Amino acid sequence: YAKIKKDLAQKFPYDIDGYCDGKENFVREMEERALAQYDGTWDKLYIAARKVQHERKLSPLIEVGSVSAAVLSAKGNIYTGVCIDTACSLGMCAERNAIANMITNGESQIIKIVAVMSDGKAGMPCGACREFMMQLDKTSGEIEILRDYETKKVIRLKSLTPEWWSTDKMEMSE
């Protein structure tokens, strides 16, 4: 318990004087319950995406890295990518870049994805990225997308692609 208390004090350095007011057992129970429910996956994905997010100009016609993304594969691996903005339509979103990295490494099933915008906030995948993800696997509708890093608000891909045009084809591929 002392280790949990110390870890929480380091993660949340605010005054927790409830321990001095006879509330320690209640606070201990609440902390243990909260820690048991804590899933650091979104933090790992967000940090992985931020690590590769370095906005830079490759040439007068290509800028990269203003947006980054990280995907968690079904095998538990994390793959990252950055956006590639070109002077014509040959660019690539960070999400599709991360997915291409995953595919290059022999995987094709996504569990979670986060896109990090240039301001550091989580952002939603564009329509092309949503479509690409839906076409990857028959379970793609269950992909969790981080909407807000601070609150860990999540939405499933199927909520963003209602009545998807090729559900029947994906189900027939079984």
Tell where the protein language model's regions lie, with residue ranges:
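Short, charged low-complexity linear segments at domain edges
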Residues: 93-112
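The feature captures the alpha-helical scaffold/lid subdomain characteristic of nucleotidyltransferase
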Residues: 2-39
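Hydrophobic "anchor" residues
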Residues: 77-78
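Short coil/turn segments at secondary-structure boundaries
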Residues: 4, 61-64
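C-terminal binding/interaction regions
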Residues: 40-59, 106-174
